[in-house]
Amino acid sequence: MESQQLSQHSHISHGSACASVTSKEVHTNQDPLDVSASKTEECEKASTKANSQQTTTPASSAVPENPHHASPQPASVPPPQNGPYPQQCMMTQNQANPSGWSFYGHPSMIPYTPYQMSPMYFPPGPQSQFPQYPSSVGTPLSTPSPESGNTFTDSSSADSDMTSTKKYVRPPPMLTSPNDFPNWVKTYIKFLQNSNLGGIIPTVNGKPVRQITDDELTFLYNTFQIFAPSQFLPTWVKDILSVDYTDIMKILSKSIEKMQSDTQEANDIVTLANLQYNGSTPADAFETKVTNIIDRLNNNGIHINNKVACQLIMRGLSGEYKFLRYTRHRHLNMTVAELFLDIHAIYEEQQGSRNSKPNYRRNLSDEKNDSRSYTNTTKPKVIARNPQKTNNSKSKTARAHNVSTSNNSPSTDNDSISKSTTEPIQLNNKHDLHLGQELTESTVNHTNHSDDELPGHLLLDSGASRTLIRSAHHIHSASSNPDINVVDAQKRNIPINAIGDLQFHFQDNTKTSIKVLHTPNIAYDLLSLNELAAVDITACFTKNVLERSDGTVLAPIVQYGDFYWVSKRYLLPSNISVPTINNVHTSESTRKYPYPFIHRMLAHANAQTIRYSLKNNTITYFNESDVDWSSAIDYQCPDCLIGKSTKHRHIKGSRLKYQNSYEPFQYLHTDIFGPVHNLPKSAPSYFISFTDETTKFRWVYPLHDRREDSILDVFTTILAFIKNQFQASVLVIQMDRGSEYTNRTLHKFLEKNGITPCYTTTADSRAHGVAERLNRTLLDDCRTQLQCSGLPNHLWFSAIEFSTIVRNSLASPKSKKSASQHAGLAGLDISTLLPFGQPVIVNDHNPNSKIHPRGIPGYALHPSRNSYGYIIYLPSLKKTVDTTNYVILQGKESRLDQFNYDALTFDEDLNRLTASYHSFIASNEIQESNDLNIESDHDFQSDIELHPEQPRNVLSKAVSPTDSTPPSTHTEDSKPISEINLRAPREVDPNISESNILPSKKRSSTPQISNIESTGSGGMHKLNVPLLAPMSQSNTHESSHASKSKDFRHSDSYSNNETNHTNVPISSTGGTNNKTVPQISDQETEKRIIHRSPSIDASPPENNSSHNIVPIKTPTTVSEQNTEESIIADLPLPDPPPEPPTELSDSFKELPPINSRQTNSSLGGIGDSNAYTTINSKKRSLEDNETEIKVSRDTWNTKNMRSLEPPRSKKRIHLIAAAKAVKSIKPIRTTLRYDEAITYNKDIKEKEKYIEAYHKEVNQLLKMNTWDTDKYYDRKEIDPKRVINSMFIFNKKRDGTHKARFVARGDIQHPDTYDTGMQSNTVHHYALMTSLSLALDNNYYITQLDISSAYLYADIKEELYIRPPPHLGMNDKLIRLKKSHYGLKQSGANWYETIKSYLIKQCGMEEVRGWSCVFKNSQVTICLFVDDMILFSKDLNANKKIITTLKKQYDTKIINLGESDNEIQYDILGLEIKYQRGKYMKLGMENSLTEKIPKLNVPLNPKGRKLSAPGQPGLYIDQDELEIDEDEYKEKVHEMQKLIGLASYVGYKFRFDLLYYINTLAQHILFPSRQVLDMTYELIQFMWDTRDKQLIWHKNKPTEPDNKLVAISDASYGNQPYYKSQIGNIFLLNGKVIGGKSTKASLTCTSTTEAEIHAVSEAIPLLNNLSHLVQELNKKPIIKGLLTDSRSTISIIKSTNEEKFRNRFFGTKAMRLRDEVSGNNLYVYYIETKKNIADVMTKPLPIKTFKLLTNKWIH
């Protein structure tokens, strides 16, 4: 606030700094309120004079030194005064500054804040000043002096004078925070004084000087209310006003009382902040003054630590003491005692040089009594000239100790020389020194941090080569020596000021001189024994004397601690003064800032940048000349070396020496590229390249993996090739440090062949530039060739090889020759070269019959390496062949997507002619899985299967190359490749992926599994939309629904688009639970509970026999018993049997896992793969129809193309690998293509109905103005990426109607033609179930609507073209779209935005935050699923009003108005619902299952009996490898996909009791053993036997005042592979089950408690999201509950113990769980295991237990 005021009055550049100090804390920018009238007058006078003499400092100039820190100013220029309220702050006509504002005297001054008391606070610099505080305070305020410009009168004239002065009074500022009240009340009191109301201000005793009048009281009350809003008043002020809202006087009295009590502390802080010392007064007096202030503040609770105190002291040092700011600035642990020792040392040096008399010392008697303790010290520190302190010296090496990098500081010298004895002396304490009476004075200036130093003595150092001394007045003949380099024992530089002579006068009257160096930066004065030996003086440590070689004793040696010392009494003082010796070096080192200090201060910038900044004045306060730059050039900062470490620089042309040193093919570079993902199993995933150093000749070899034997085979091949073809021997191979090169196998091979491996250094890819650049070039060429040709990605290595052949023949600009010429090879004959992807016709030398066509369309790849032929790709046969029997198609563009095969689809004669090929393609190419593996005589690509993604359009994902039949792609499920996640789960072995699961025929020895569920990118994918994140829900239905309308969703398909459950993962489950929860009584549990918040009650009821549930958390406002009964009253918990059943349930739960191996597999499955209700695939397989499968097989067999038929090979399938590879579940294709519905449909009646539907669809498209009918565009004129292929799909709905839909091929849509950020949302299934549950409880009417051709109401922004419908016969023309056509990527998002905008703007709805497609207003709730709308309202007329509004814009059909009071049947998004308003609701799928299950060809009721449970406990899947024929394997996988797809769809709709078994079997889709198939059949059989079961809901009691949302949680510990645990949750709203989830824990839990904690933590986020939805849809209060059968989990939730957990993952979840439970009004209760219905989600259960837990809610 104050900083803003200052900026608004920037024209005032000077003023007094003020501060306000409350009890125990320091505030900024205000002074303590001086309540003394006399003091106020004096301060205002001084302030007026000071302000009249101030001058403005230019902003660009350096900040001047604080005048209070310098020598006294002349009398004519008094220093600035700091009164409590400066003159410019008074409210006069000439000065408009409001009272209470503060200004600083210098731009560099900073306010003193409480943060400066922190030991982590560092002031900006030595010159930064604190505000100047008033020097005194007095009695309470009264009228100011006349000089202030305002004359106050007594009470008799107050009213009359108020009128004349009000016009000059400026009101106080507004109070904006309770923390600002102490400062604000001062300005308010000042406002009253300026308003002639100073007499009514209370004094110290709380009474005003005069009686306040009623008008004054009214004025006081009104102004206080105006300028101090009630919301910003402190609590104690509000308490006073709550008693009497007019008692402003009491507030003022209490405020003044607080201020008065703080004045002494404020004065101490002000004094401490403005300390000044330049040596003019004794150092002891200065020390006493400072220590008294610190002691007084410490006693009052304001703790000034050593660091802050030292900073404040150093700020006030000037003159000779100023350099202590810099030498001491880096000492983090410096104490006040140490700093004063330095000050004493300088002071005594000054006194010794100026007065030539002994140093100033205090009397010994005073020293003993002058003991003070400082803050933050562990024991008392004696601050005295002769401190009485015990010796605690430590052994140290006698080396120079650099104080600039340590905590030691120098002590002063004692120059008194007296006679002493030469007896050997051993001192245990420095105070026991006895060298005669004179020697007692040598114990001076003990340094607090150098307990092992003997003051007044020189330390004898045998390791020092030079003598160093700190005292300047002992040096004779001093001279500057900046070139001397001295280091301490730690190799740190010691700055040297000067060099001179040290003269000794020993007791035999002999004089000796040695060289000495002067520096203040050492801890001891060191006397070098080496230099003494040079003048014939040695130290005898047996007699402890210094003596000459002739035995003459010169001086005694004193042993103190571990060191030996000699007294300074033998040193002769010099005549040079201290200032002179300090200036010998012209202050180049000691008085200048050392460069390392500046380097660190300025963020480790380099010297050049710092010098340039100082020259240009971008850094102020000091200049370039103030820095010692002598060490800048050679200075090496270790922090910079670590933090700015870079790689070494590579010299350009450094490889020339290798080219000159080696012959061709002697030095090779090699590197591996890969892997390339999403490829068929037979396509290579890597390639390895070799480059010769001299000739630059390149080789490339394909690799399927990076195993040692694969790499070794390649090395063997190329070495043999070079040896035989070029008669050369490879000497050196350079490679990186990848494991494929550094393994022992390859190393031994190279060693055996005499080849030297040359490895790059770590993380130095530039050193491997030759191989790296080649790979980059080849990849660039590969991408370009594939883009230009439109060939599928699995031919990527053919493009690599083509590029290698060409580039080996291209000349290098440097050498003017090609690599082939350097190698002595012939050049490339371009007449034999074809463009990559050139269309050709290959002769079929073995046709099926004599009348069969002899030509097969193909695409040229590259010249053959093994013959004179060409490698040609045949898409119709899914193979590459090496042949010379081909003809180039003249005039044909070399792009696959340019071929128009649509005409073939509708020409019956042509179709009949190529019927065998159509069958072949239909069964083998268009289907999802890679069915065929056709061989040829080609070496490495003969077995490449056609990727399900066909040759593509420019950057498209897939397109049929022949299209002789309409593509079978079900674009509703299409997803772009960029959205496909092919990464394995975390716990999956990274070496196992979709691309290497099934080996090719040549790699059959490696157990792998075929990539059955291929997408357009060659792999499987899952949708990354979490179930428990409705706020970010992005259901794929809307985006993929473009391919078909609502009618197809309501067909018999149960794909992803119907269920809205692509985001619901199915995790592996199974096994048994191994919980070992200790038996703890309820009373013991209660004792462990600590009351953490008001919402947790630590005293649960002891008895709860009704449900045996122990309450854990209840609000204090509701009784525990009522809350418990309220939450569990309507839950469908099982009733206990009359007699306790066998302990099977509990004992089963306690059983340990049967198989403890890491790869164990129970019914819970393997891995963390998520199974979904659908897969968004590029193409639809004809295998969905059993008839089509048989026809396709017959066609294949009757063709009898022996040269093309793949051999039937056995596949070895391993359970672990198969389970890890599971990504999703394949849906059943229920739609028909054009040729199936019309062209080849033999059912005449059905054909006619489809034709009728066809024309109806076309008419609707024309009616909706879907495309521009005025103009048709030529295909060649349009950018290919804006052209979208189209197709017709047909379907028969459940009600018997036939539907046709014309859709665009969005699966091959270019990314540039749509906004990838747009989302097409649909209602979440939980939102629908929640809305249905609330409708039942509140007697809502449910109305079902359908909007015809919904997508066509949304305009399209992009420029897109499609092919016209086939009946128009314009296959070479295009039409431009105007509407969001079905199948386009953006259609779903465009429709969502369109309908959302209309509902909000025209219907008055609003979307519920976090729940897309749920709209509401005060009467109606709408759930939107693309073009389906479900309306809920208590008033049917409200629904009708919405319908009327919708019909104005859209063709809206009322499927079911829901007005009947009897039972109404709905078919809502696949759910068959029976609803009788106010009574019940039943949700099932009996009709749908009755129709769909028989079509699965599963033998139903083989033994004529019904199953009672979907699975049996204790049954574990056999883990033996599965050996099966490839065709049989694919059939079984396809069958598993259909069966599990249907089961998953039903389970996530309403059969939550089956989720565990569904998830388990979903993990084994790629492991279709007999056992797995039998379990799947058993699940389908159980679904068939219980197809009439329904999810039953009953209306909630009308008396219930709250909505109750409950989650029941359970976990099965460690029953999954890799010791993962299975967790399950069931969610209930008002006793009705609305959802469930079963999944595997993402973390490996080490105990039952961890597993339960994980389960609970997974349930809470969705519970909170559902709570928000319920509160938005229904305004009744909501109670959230969570039930678990783990007492230990409950204990952790309630505990306040925050000690470290066993591991950080578990600890994080547990701490977060505590916060969520305590912060979300969540009630947690214990539930018995036998009543925990979530148990069915975590493990297989016995029949009796399964029925007991499910018969209450589904029957």
UniProtKB/Swiss-Prot annotation:
Entry keyword NADP: no
Region listing for Integrase-type zinc finger-like, in residue ranges: 583-640
Positions annotated as active site in the UniProt record: 461
Binding-site residues for Mg(2+) 2, renumbered to this chain: 1346, 1427-1428
Domain Integrase catalytic: 660-829
Signal peptide boundaries: none
Localization (cell): Cytoplasm; Nucleus
Listed Polar residues bias regions: 48-60, 127-152, 1005-1015, 1053-1082, 1101-1111
Coiled-coil stretches noted in the UniProt entry, renumbered to this chain: none
Span(s) of short sequence motif Bipartite nuclear localization signal: 1178-1212
RNase H Ty1/copia-type domain residues: 1610-1752
Enzyme Commission no: 3.4.23.-, 2.7.7.49, 2.7.7.7, 3.1.26.4
Domain remark from Swiss-Prot or TrEMBL: The C-terminal RNA-binding region of CA is sufficient for all its nucleocapsid-like chaperone activities.
Description of how the protein assembles with itself and partners: The capsid protein forms a homotrimer, from which the VLPs are assembled. The protease is a homodimer, whose active site consists of two apposed aspartic acid residues.
Note: Retrotransposons are mobile genetic entities that are able to replicate via an RNA intermediate and a reverse transcription step. In contrast to retroviruses, retrotransposons are non-infectious, lack an envelope and remain intracellular. Ty1 retrotransposons belong to the copia elements (pseudoviridae).
Protein name: Transposon Ty1-LR3 Gag-Pol polyprotein
Species this protein is from: Saccharomyces cerevisiae (strain ATCC 204508 / S288c)
The encoding gene: TY1B-LR3
